[in-house]
């Protein structure tokens, strides 16, 4: 299944986070944090500005990004992978 985000939205595959503490204890449930890092799988065409022009996105497919977990992301399952659909505004940094 192909999925194409609209406007300034992107599709991010969340990267796995280590499920053990520094002391070797396996974390479960609420103690295990979800990663706020992921890989961009698809990007929309850009943000439409007030004057009607299109502003392209700063991120591109393949970028590793750090995003805000609590900022309106929506988790979906696509082809067995957990992906997030979010606005580029919710991405805080590109990892280079």
Curated annotation (Swiss-Prot):
Keywords annotated in UniProt: Chaperone, Cytoplasm
Origin: domain of life: Bacteria
GO biological process: chaperone cofactor-dependent protein refolding
InterPro entries named among the record's database cross-references: Chaperonin_GroES, Chaperonin_GroES_sf, Chaprnonin_Cpn10_CS, GroES-like_sf
Cross-referenced Gene3D superfamilies: GroES chaperonin
Claim: Endoplasmic reticulum is one of the keywords in the record: no
Compartments where found: Cytoplasm
Family matches, as PROSITE patterns: CHAPERONINS_CPN10
Cross-referenced SMART domains: Cpn10
GO molecular function: ATP binding; metal ion binding; protein folding chaperone; protein-folding chaperone binding; unfolded protein binding
Keyword Ribonucleoprotein: no
GO cellular-component term (any): cytoplasm
Pfam families per record: Cpn10
Function statement: Together with the chaperonin GroEL, plays an essential role in assisting protein folding. The GroEL-GroES system forms a nano-cage that allows encapsulation of the non-native substrate proteins and provides a physical environment optimized to promote and accelerate protein folding. GroES binds to the apical surface of the GroEL ring, thereby capping the opening of the GroEL channel.
Family assignment from sequence similarity: Belongs to the GroES chaperonin family.
Quaternary structure and interacting proteins, as annotated: Heptamer of 7 subunits arranged in a ring. Interacts with the chaperonin GroEL.
Protein known as: Co-chaperonin GroES
Species annotation: Vibrio atlanticus (strain LGP32)
Designated gene of the protein: groES
